[in-house]
């Protein structure tokens, strides 16, 4: 396959480079990623500033470019200027940290994959659980991403769907399997620590904790129970459950 590889952690991040090195052994890979860390960029794009593109050398067989913009910018620029017309799949990751539950609304990783789907290119976001003070093992996540590609044939890929793949932090032997599941509820309870600088300005620093609803059948539940999760996503945010009900409110 011809693969466009991007992320939100930046072009030098361990996750994307681990994945690029493995995928490039079996597929034609072009890496286009932010020059710096752009986590939680969501689906923002650059409008009022020029985007700077730099070619980057990598020690394995990929063509690589850094972009001064956001993760979504990377996909837009790549598909318009940097990659061949016959890209088979956009892959975003491997992200440092899960993108499950409400995380997906903030995620630059997921949004880059969604941007690919908006261009009618099948896309997948790949994220690995991060545990503070423990060393990440991106090789396990890369192996699952490659395995997912090997199970998918080109004719199986829907061009407007994003596959959201998340891998728990544990040994490969501890992983219980793969669960296709829906998005769960994982909310960051935001609090800001307030300080005052020398000029008397308020300085707000983000802190808080995570509130998870552990309902069986969701990505949050299965990650907690050491399953790899796969969730199909779509960029159409219409709430079809109340579409007709809402219409009736304005007809009455």
Curated annotation (Swiss-Prot):
This is 5'-nucleotidase SurE. Transmembrane segments: none annotated. One of its GO terms (molecular function) is nucleotide binding. A divalent metal cation binds at residues 8-9, 39, 95. It is found in: Cytoplasm. Keywords: Cytoplasm, Hydrolase, Metal-binding, Nucleotide-binding. Disulfide bonds: none annotated. SUPFAM superfamilies: SurE-like. Its EC number is 3.1.3.5. Binds 1 divalent metal cation per subunit. The keyword Hydrolase applies.
């Amino acid at each position: 396959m011809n693969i466009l590889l991007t992320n939100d952690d930046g072009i030098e991040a361990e996750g994307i480079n681990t994945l690029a090195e493995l995928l490039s052994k079996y597929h034609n890979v072009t890496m286009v990623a932010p020059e710096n860390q752009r986590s939680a960029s969501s689906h923002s794009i650059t409008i009022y500033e020029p985007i700077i593109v730099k070619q980057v050398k990598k020690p394995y067989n990929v063509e690589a470019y850094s972009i001064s913009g956001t993760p979504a910018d990377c996909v837009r620029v790549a598909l318009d200027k940097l990659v061949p017309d016959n890209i088979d799949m956009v892959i975003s990751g491997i992200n440092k940290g899960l993108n499950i539950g409400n995380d997906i609304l903030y995620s630059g990783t997921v949004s880059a994959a969604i941007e690919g789907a908006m261009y009618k290119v099948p896309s997948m976001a790949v994220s690995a659980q991060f545990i503070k003070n423990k060393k990440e093992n991106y090789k396990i996540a890369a192996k699952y991403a490659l395995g997912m590609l090997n199970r998918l044939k080109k004719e199986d890929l829907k061009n407007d769907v994003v596959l959201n793949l998340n891998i728990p932090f544990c040994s490969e032997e501890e992983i219980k399997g793969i669960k296709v599941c829906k998005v769960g509820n994982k909310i960051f309870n935001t609090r800001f620590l307030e300080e005052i600088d020398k000029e008397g300005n308020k300085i707000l620093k983000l802190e808080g904790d995570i509130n998870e609803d552990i309902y069986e059948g969701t990505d949050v539940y299965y990650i907690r129970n050491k399953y790899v999760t796969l969730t199909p996503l779509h960029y159409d945010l219409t709430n079809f459950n109340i579409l007709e009900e809402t219409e009736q409110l304005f007809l009455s």
